[in-house]
Amino acid sequence: MTDSTRSLRNCLAPAKLNLFLHITGRRPNGYHDLQSVFQLLNWGDTLHFTLRDDGRVARVTDVPGVPEESDLVVRAANLLKAHTGTAHGVDVEIDKILPMGAGLGGGSSDAATTLLALNRLWQLDLPRAELQSLAVKLGADVPFFIFGKNAFAEGIGEELAEVELPTRWFLVVTPRVHVPTAEIFSDELLTRDTKPVTIADFLAQQTSDAEWPDSFGRNDMQEVVTRKYAEVAQVVKWLYDVTPARMTGSGASVFAAFHSKHEAEAAKAKLPASWNGAVAESLNEHPLFAFAS
């Protein structure tokens, strides 16, 4: 990342994985209570920010399928601008590589990187807690990326506690299918009564003899998604022939963990050509963590 008084270049918006995802209840307003562990990855979209003196927020690159006015990046910048009353504006360039509808948190991470970067570029110096309270207005996953550490998440995903995770390499496989999150959450057969667990329960997996991620929990959405989307089911089966695997979020991406980059790359080399595969190392901290206190 490069930093100057008028621009911030090469700001990573890291992907996330849900190492497990349990749905423990449903609220009267339709939102679901969940428990999960969010894992940051050293892989994601890259954003570039250039200061404008006319107060305008503009996305200067096209993102297919995402109109500028509904882009979470633009919404995040305008939300921060309205909250603080700053006279500054910004041009935002987005190098988009994360697939949408994949369960990797791409749009949410882009929004969080925007809030963090503009907190620095616009010299706002808002504390992390204040940015998180803004972030929840943009989506349930956005506060996690502002939190900036791997986390045990509860509530609708906004109750976060830091959790230390070992370094791993991941192969993330995404079929050519978009899975709408709302469709999965509304499915009548979705499990909504998984027994709550604790951080201690999760950390105890480190001493388990079972091969990770089979050693703890499951993704409650995976059964519904694989029933509705044959392509996701095929990815899960293919990866399971190599090593234990699990879907992240509401899909469509599926991941497996490896001890080395070499092992992950070797598995990726065998992927069918119609699937998108990426090898990424785990992160312990968001690259822009220092942009809020």
UniProtKB/Swiss-Prot annotation:
GO terms for molecular function: 4-(cytidine 5'-diphospho)-2-C-methyl-D-erythritol kinase activity; ATP binding. The keyword Disulfide bond does not apply. It comes from Burkholderia orbicola (strain MC0-3). The gene is ispE. Its EC number is 2.7.1.148. This is 4-diphosphocytidyl-2-C-methyl-D-erythritol kinase. PANTHER family: 4-DIPHOSPHOCYTIDYL-2-C-METHYL-D-ERYTHRITOL KINASE, CHLOROPLASTIC (PTHR43527:SF2). Belongs to the GHMP kinase family. IspE subfamily. ATP binds at P99, M100, G101, A102, G103, L104, G105, G106, G107, S108, S109. Catalyzes the phosphorylation of the position 2 hydroxy group of 4-diphosphocytidyl-2C-methyl-D-erythritol. It comes from the Bacteria.
